[in-house]
Regions:
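Transmembrane-helix signature of polytopic, membrane-embedded enzymes
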Residues: 58-73, 105-127, 180, 184, ...
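Signature aromatic-anchored transmembrane alpha helix within multi-pass, membrane-resident enzymes
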Residues: 204, 244-249, 366-374, 407-417, ...
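Interfacial juxtamembrane loops and adjacent helix segments
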Residues: 25, 29-93, 266-304
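Perimembrane helix-loop-helix junctions
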Residues: 154-160, 178-180, 188-189, 202-249, ...
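C-terminal luminal/periplasmic domains and tails of membrane-associated envelope-modifying transferases
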Residues: 340, 411, 417, 453, ...
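Transmembrane-helix motifs of polytopic, lipid-linked glycan transferases
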Residues: 92-112, 150
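Short helix- or helix-capping micro-motifs
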Residues: 121-126, 153, 189, 193
């Protein structure tokens, strides 16, 4: 209940409430195909809203005629002045269904393994933070899970009267339940279809279970402990077909009743269909899968997801104690099979000798428990809509029941698993494991453990281990309260580290508006810039905010130079999904937040700073001048395009600028990383550096040198002290633009050998003269490769400039008044 009363209305809850209320108020299902969900969960959640007299009539909302879901949701939910009242009212039915689901999990596990199994399964469900979070929110998830589990429980045959079970009686396998149970299966199957479209996967699974039950329910004659089928295949076929007709016929009728027995047209269909809205929902779902859905996984952003999304989500969002129990169960089962020799003894002949009915009876409980979750898990690998761990919720009840039953039968609390003292040896009572499978019988005696200490008995160790795991689960869940939605296990770094791996409904669903208001009140803040994909209206929460992209109400925003103020940014848009592009909030992504509200809403304080007036775009950067100007806040921005690998440019004045380059581009030493931009695949694509207004000073200034040309020579920096054959001498020459020339030119850099000839040449100019302005400082980087066969002697580094069209060098006058066409910068002595 803590999560239900603490969380603000989340992204999906608004449409669910609005559609449910509109359906109940009008009896019209026009919004269901738009939302791509059947109506059951919506109307269950919205039923309490019928008691609210201050909600508008959906038919009076502008947009009703065109089935505008956003307009109806805004009018019914987001503008409602009492969001806490609406959220609590809508979440109560979801909480009740969660309680019923817990009871169902307990009952199923108890039927299979006794009350200890039921209690363990219920404990795992009760303290799973994911179930707590989604079980208290208005979505289709928990209703769908409940009716899926209820359908499978009924179809399994475990739903029985006190005497009802699969057993041998009068030489026949009989199930105590009658045809009424088949009708109940049909009703539950139909209701599940009305809860969520993914419940369609129940249909083939239920069909298989009914087929197996049909095989198991046929009359058999018992001879020499082996069963033989006496009825003809036709009788089995008729029985199964009759059962299918009853169950699926009732399910179809329930679905039709759920839509008010409507008969409506389906786009592309030749004639109207019963429950045509349901068919249109599947058409919308197909379009949705084709278009994809924004999603994030470990730094990557995609609209069509990855096959490994849900496996990663399961590993990172499932509590580690549950993962350990599951791993231990699988490992123990494999060891049991290996020790018993099952893998060696089962063969084709055993299958041939096995009785079909015996097989059916013995495999039915396991298939009932694991067939659906296995198929569901496999289907998730092919999903192109990867929006959250919540789509794995249907797996969890089956996992809990399985762990509860396994743990009590082969772990703690089982009559087959209790260790007792016998003949001065620790021995497992009833340790004989009999597995009869296809007429094969395997007997496995329990291992015997020396009596070192009562506390070190296998049973005591198991009991202690289970107790510690459950304690770990409970403490870990309570530690994240009331922010259960943001739970991540220790592999992901806990709730505070989960944003690096998964977002959206895994972490940030717009649930922290009450936290934001409380923080602003506590710190005396009266305004915030708010960035989130939820269309919530913050004024109904008492928050004065300006919205940022992707909200259609967004104010002007400069992603690389945000205005000063307080910013609240959801972890989802921070990582890229739903935002205009993956780097909309990259400026914030590279900075530590002021605080994190509920692990999902990040607060930043942006201080005032000067707006850049110039930008340098290096090769490999795909931004246009207009794009750069917009992301820096507009205004009069000068954009330069030098060859950044060899040239740096600094406009005159003291105004700051930025340099945008690929991550492997060499940048000036004083450049500070301001924004790191990444691709949709997660790799660093380019980096925005912030540069101070003044140009750097050369290590060796030579301002007294006069150059007969449009440039003034300022000095140089030499990154070498010796001449080493095979190495390169790195030289930086500094020039200031005096005038803009009308002809091409180049800057000279030579290494002269002992005889005065050039042994290395590094001429070049990486800044087109078309972009020059008087006062620009050009830093040209030259590389002079020393020959590997360089002779001993004196080597001289010189520089200068010349016109490219005539190759005429400029006249240069040094400080002594001597003239020439080069400037001697440095001399090296190369000795033997």
């Amino acid at each position: 209940m803590a999560h239900a009363t603490h969380a603000s209305i989340t992204f999906d809850e608004g449409p669910h409430l609005a559609i449910g209320y509109a359906t109940l108020r009008t009896g019209d299902f026009r919004l269901q195909p738009v939302h791509i969900h059947p109506p059951l969960a919506n109307v269950l959640a919205a039923a309490p809203l019928l008691l609210q007299s201050d909600l508008p009539d959906p038919r009076a909302v502008d947009g009703w005629e065109i089935a505008s879901l956003s307009a109806i949701t805004d009018a019914v939910v987001w503008q409602y002045p009492h969001p806490a009242r609406m959220a609590t009212a809508g979440r109560v039915p979801m909480l009740l269904l969660s309680v019923l689901l817990g009871a169902l999990i307990y009952r199923w596990a108890k039927d299979l393994g006794g009350w200890r199994a039921g209690l363990l399964a219920l404990t795992l469900f009760t303290f799973d933070p994911n179930c707590i979070a989604h079980g208290s929110l208005i979505t289709t998830d928990m209703p769908a899970v409940f009716f899926m589990v209820a359908t499978m429980y009924a179809a399994s045959g475990e739903w029985r009267m006190a005497s009802g079970e699969w057993r041998m009686a009068n030489g026949k396998w009989r199930m105590a339940n009658g045809e009424w149970r088949m009708a109940a299966v049909g009703v539950l199957l139909g209701v599940a279809q009305l809860a969520k479209v993914s419940a369609l996967m129940l249909v083939p699974v239920v069909g298989v279970l009914l087929l197996i039950q049909g095989l198991a329910n046929e009359e058999l004659r018992i001879t020499n402990c082996e069963s033989r089928i006496t009825n003809h295949a036709s009788r089995i076929t008729i029985h199964v077909l009759r059962t299918w007709a009853v169950v699926f016929g009732i399910a179809a009728l329930v679905v039709w009743a759920g839509y008010g027995f409507e008969i409506s047209a389906v786009p592309g269909g030749p004639f109207p269909l019963p429950a045509g809205t349901h068919a249109r929902i599947f058409q919308s779902l197909r379009e949705h899968y084709e278009l994809g859905h924004p999603t994030f996984l470990m730094g990557r952003v995609s609209n069509h997801g990855w096959w490994w999304y849900f496996p990663v989500a399961f590993v990172l969002k499932t509590p580690l104690p549950i993962l350990f129990l599951g791993f231990w169960a699988v490992l123990r089962l494999m060891l049991e099979c290996w020790n018993a020799g099952m893998l060696k003894r089962l063969n084709v002949k055993a299958f041939e000798r096995a009785n079909v009915q015996t097989l059916a009876c013995r495999t039915l409980p396991g298939l009932s428990l694991f067939l659906f979750p296995v198929l569901y898990a496999l289907s998730s690998l092919f999903s192109t809509v990867n929006i959250g761990y919540r789509h794995l919720l249907p797996l969890l009840p089956f996992l809990y029941v399985g762990l509860g039953v396994w743990s009590t039968k082969y772990g703690v609390g089982s009559r087959n698993g209790e260790w007792q003292m016998a003949n001065d040896k620790w021995q497992m009572t009833n340790g004989e494991l009999r597995i009869t499978h296809h007429a094969s019988r395997i007997t496995h005696h329990a291992s015997r453990i020396p009596p070192y200490s009562l506390l070190l008995t296998p049973y005591s160790l198991l009991l202690t281990s289970y107790s510690l795991l459950l304690l770990w689960l409970i403490i870990g869940t309570l530690a994240v309260s009331p922010h259960f939605l943001t739970f991540f296990n220790e592999i992901a770094g806990g709730a505070r580290g989960g944003y690096r791996y998964l977002v959206d409904s895994n972490l940030d669903w717009g649930q922290n508006l009450w936290d934001l208001r409380a923080w602003m009140d506590a710190h005396g803040e009266d305004h915030v810039y708010y960035a989130h994909y939820s269309p919530a209206r913050l004024d109904v929460y008492g928050i004065n905010a300006d919205f940022l992209p992707p909200d259609p109400r967004a104010v002007a925003f400069a992603p690389w130079n945000p205005a000063p103020g307080l910013y609240a940014i959801g972890a989802t848009v921070l990582q890229g999904p739903y935002a205009p592009d993956v780097n909309t909030y990259a400026w914030f992504r590279g900075r530590e937040p002021l605080t994190r509200l509920g692990n999902a809403l990040w607060l930043y304080r942006v201080p005032p700073r000067e707006t850049p007036t110039w930008a340098v775009l290096c090769a490999g950067v795909s931004f246009s001048s207009d794009t750069v100007a917009q992301r820096l806040g507009g205004g009069d921005l000068r954009v330069l395009w030098p060859d950044c690998a060899h040239t740096s440019v600094y406009p005159p004045g003291q105004q700051p600028g930025v340099l945008i380059a690929s991550p492997d581009t060499a940048v000036p030493p004083r450049a500070e990383v301001d924004v790191t931009l990444r691709s949709a695949g997660g790799e660093t694509e380019s980096v925005v550096y912030r540069l101070s207004g003044s140009a750097p000073t050369p290590e060796t200034p030579l301002s007294a040198v006069e150059v007969d040309g449009p440039l003034d020579f300022l000095g140089y920096t030499l990154h070498a002290e010796t001449v080493t054959p095979g190495d390169a001498i790195l030289l930086e020459t500094y020039w200031r633009v005096r005038d803009v020339p009308g002809r091409p030119l180049s800057l000279l850099a030579h290494l002269l050998g002992p005889d005065g000839s050039a042994v290395a040449v590094g001429d070049g100019l990486g800044f087109p003269i078309e972009q020059w302005q008087p006062g620009d400082v050009i830093v040209q980087r030259h590389s002079l490769a020393v020959p590997v066969d360089a002779r001993p002697g004196t080597y001289t580094v010189i520089t200068g400039a010349y016109w490219l069209d005539t190759m005429e060098r400029w006249t240069i006058t040094d400080a002594t008044g001597q003239t020439g066409d080069t400037i001697r910068l440095y001399r090296f002595e190369r000795r033997e």
